[in-house]
Amino acid sequence: MFKTATCLTVTLAGLTAFAEVGSIRMGEDGIKRSSASAEERLALIAPVAAGVLRCRPTFCSCGVCYGAPARLEGVRFEYRQAGGEWTTADDFTYFEETRDYRGSLLGLEENTDYEIRVAQGDKVLASEKTRTWSSEIKIAKTVTLDPARIKFPLEIRDRGNPTGWIRYTMPSGKTIVNDTDQPAIVLDGAQFVVLEGLKIEGGKASKSIRLKGTKCVRILNCELYGWGRDSEVKYDGLGRPFVPGSPAPTVNRNANGGFSMKGSKGQISGDYAIEIDRGCCETVIERCYIHDCRVHANSWYYSHPAGGGAILARSPDHSTVIRWNDLVGSDLHRWDDAVTSGGNFSEDGGLNRDADVYGNFMIFANDDCIELDGGQQNVRCWGNRFESSLVGVSIQGCMVSPVYVFQNGFYGMCDQFGNAGQTVKTGGGAHGNEAYAFVRKNLFWGDGMGMIWMPLLRSQLKDNVFCGNQKIVRQESSPLSSSVGDRFGVEIPEEGLSGNLPVRPVGFRLSRSRFSGITVKAGKVEPGALSFSAKSTCDRPLGFTIAKNRDFPWFNVIPETGVIPAGGEVTFTVTFDTAKMNDRHFYRGAFLVRTAEGLSRAVSL
């Protein structure tokens, strides 16, 4: 079983436009808002009652809500490890509509008891004890799957318990090949179940793994690729993918550039490898390599992207964790979003509430690397590396809040045609009336628009680094937003980008994480070869394998397998196959130096 303390302990203080989008309205002031009634909003937000302190921990964070009929003078939110010294938490905000305080505790220790209290002066108004999650779980039963005997979809309804999880795995070196039009696995009402070490290719359904009404399901160290429906592009259908043989839709455009479309039944949207459905809670997706969807999402050059991606969060109830995954698209099979939301402008949409997204590598989306749109109630996105996509993180449709975006690296935003959008997207849709976004200590590097301030979204920026021309746009439109300690116009050479992003407990670091400027002229590649090294940061040898998408046959990495000695170093060479570099304008790719545990460092080209 994987343990986070193996080499390093980490502690740090789409479908969008086509389905399940909450309705919005344009106010007389020209500002977009949710069209839901106050009663409907409260039902979806599910605020706590007056005097109630609700704490929802994950591995290293805890979402906290405290019900209060009115704003309290001098109120403090404090926490400590059991028996330790009290620490006052920052960024707890009172919300008039729901009559509660909300905020998150960050940088907690895994598998640790904490005490949390609300205090005013010398009086303790409420207190709770909680415990953060553990990576180590007790397995009561292991089911070893035989790929040759699986009937698709494999339906799992098992119910383990907190002291006895049920694990599904398979022999190493085998592959589950799904050649049907059904998902490979459907978990329906399953509880305390682990999928670990599965390698699944196919099938022709819109999903590979579906979670329906589950509690405490973990998907660990799996590889998913080659799923998605057969498709063809209809350029008279806004350039989007359609089921082959579908009639072309009728598109009517208006003077403002908008459009309506009829006859779009065959359009393909939402082909995501993993779907977390409404009602699921305490889901973990960790150390997975998801790549090579069969559907290519169109660029905004034609219309709003449609196609596929890696993970779809369709309003799970609470406590979803997506960590340490590699979600790698390609120019031949771009993601729509790598991670997308269902119910973008709904108060319970997207990841909804009390969720963590950290330590992930997401690359090659024609829209967003990750779409947090929806509730965003104590949703935290940190320590990730977002790259070569139109948008890094979308927090538009922040309907409840607070949302936290911090310590991420945004590298070279671009769609398949090289166009860049907002690096952190806020504009284009509605926000909640009291929405807060805390955006801190992020690196905005390379192409990208930076961030736009919106009237209803209180963007609290602090200590971000904006390189090149990236900046904050329309600051005058949001007088309640702030920028403190942000730096602009900073120049950082590509070779100076950290090899430690995304943040992961992996026992080595890379001397270089990104190479750009690769050109092909007259059958020659410049530069002819690239080199970098991996240096150990732990006291044991680490075996590795180079992992790359099937869409990247035009380069090779040597050595492909090997061992990084304890305290030692391995040098790698990237070479190019010019015979396979004659069919496109751009050659962009990525690969992973990946351990058997599923942890990796990524290099992009």
Residue positions per predicted region:
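Extracellular beta-strand/beta-solenoid scaffold signature
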Residues: 180-185, 204-210, 233-277, 298-317, ...
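Recognizes extended acidic, P/S/T-rich segments that occur
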Residues: 76-111
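A short beta-strand micro-motif common to beta-rich folds, especially ectodomain repeats
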Residues: 584-597
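Surface-exposed binding patches on compact interaction domains or structured appendages
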Residues: 506-519, 537-575
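Long, low-complexity ectodomains and other extracytoplasmic segments of secretory-pathway proteins
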Residues: 503-543, 596-605
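Extracellular beta-strand-rich solenoid/capping regions of secreted or surface-exposed proteins
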Residues: 107, 148-167, 176-218, 230, ...
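Predominantly extracellular beta-rich ligand-binding scaffolds that present long acidic/polar faces
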Residues: 404-502
